[in-house]
Amino acid sequence: MVLHPGVRKSLLVLHVTCSVGMMGTVAAFLVLAIVGIGASDPQTLQAAYLSMDMLARLLILPLVLASLVIGVVQSLLSNWGLFRHWWIVVKLVASIIVPVVLLLQLPGIRLVAAAAASGLPLDGLRGPRMSFIVHGGGGFVILLVPMLLSVYKPRGLTRYGWRKQYELGKASGS
């Protein structure tokens, strides 16, 4: 099934908007994580970690999931397909890794935010706080991969893609 051009472009704009918003919020999360590690003043720590908690739960996770769902819908309703091209499969895998890692990080983010909000010392939570920098930076790099693949669209069909192309050629009499 091929989408009407107006619907296809609307989905594309929504997908790109979610993806760009997600990258921006991950960048903000990373900056706050760096500020949180370097700060000693309780107000800065509280502001940084409470903001990180809200960014992760209320912006990053919904944007990641929206981008993933919209991307899957777009590929299923277009000639590109979901499993025909390697670059789309890599985008899909990257788009699944990010929310999984984020969901695994959320309890730690909540814990540090709650400790900062209550004014408890965060010295014993240095491991999770460093993890926010590592995972935030890694997440940003992983999010760059789908963006680059979307722009360059490298050649290369999957086995499924080759089989589909062969079947289409055979059906059309080529």
Region roles according to the model:
Residues M1-S174:
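Polytopic transmembrane helical bundles with strong interfacial aromatic enrichment
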